Structures are given as structure tokens and as C-alpha cells.
Amino acid sequence: MNSKFVLIVVFLAVVSICFANEVWDPEKCGCPPFDKVENAVCTKDRATYDNRCQFDCHAKFLSKSGKTLEESPCIESADPK
């Protein structure tokens, strides 16, 4: 029972780090590395999170700057599921 509590606390800490770092802000995500992580992972530098979310975030970033995914400098590394 204690371990479940610890896991919940750790999960909440990770989620709050994500949102504190504005991981979903397309203005700040730019061209994050596209890796093949199965589950969403958040890091302090906002660089690693779920592949699908990276792709979506990148697409939003590009559409805000008036570009398409084809015009993206980092689309070759994208591998959306």
C-alpha cells in the first residue's frame, strides 16, 4: 500500500514538472527529437515525450509559423504511429 502511494506521488511530480515546463506549448517545443518511446515520458528539457505527442506538437508549431509538415527541417526523423 505504501508503494502505491509513492508511485502516485512520483507520477504527480512528473506530471507537474511537465506542465511547469510547458511541455505542450508549441511555441517552445519546436523540433523535439522524435524517439520511439511507447509511453509518455517527460524530461526537464521538454525533449522527450510520447512519439505521437511530439508529432502533434511539431505539427501545431509549424502551422503557427505558416509551414507544412513537408517543409519541416526535422520531418525526416518523425515516425508517427
From Swiss-Prot:
A GO term from the CC aspect: extracellular region
Key words of the record: Disulfide bond, Secreted, Signal, Toxin
Molecular function per GO: toxin activity
Tissue spec. comment: Expressed by the venom apparatus.
PTM description: Contains 3 disulfide bonds.
Main location: secreted
Record's subcellular location: Secreted
Keyword Signal: yes
Source organism superkingdom: Eukaryota
Record field: transmembrane: none
Pfam families referenced in this protein's UniProt entry, alphabetically: Kazal_2
Signal sequence annotation: 1-20
Family that this chain belongs to: Belongs to the caterpillar 3 family.
Described purpose of this protein according to its UniProt entry: Probable toxin.
Record protein name field: U-megalopygitoxin(3)-Mo4
Organism: Megalopyge opercularis (Southern flannel moth)
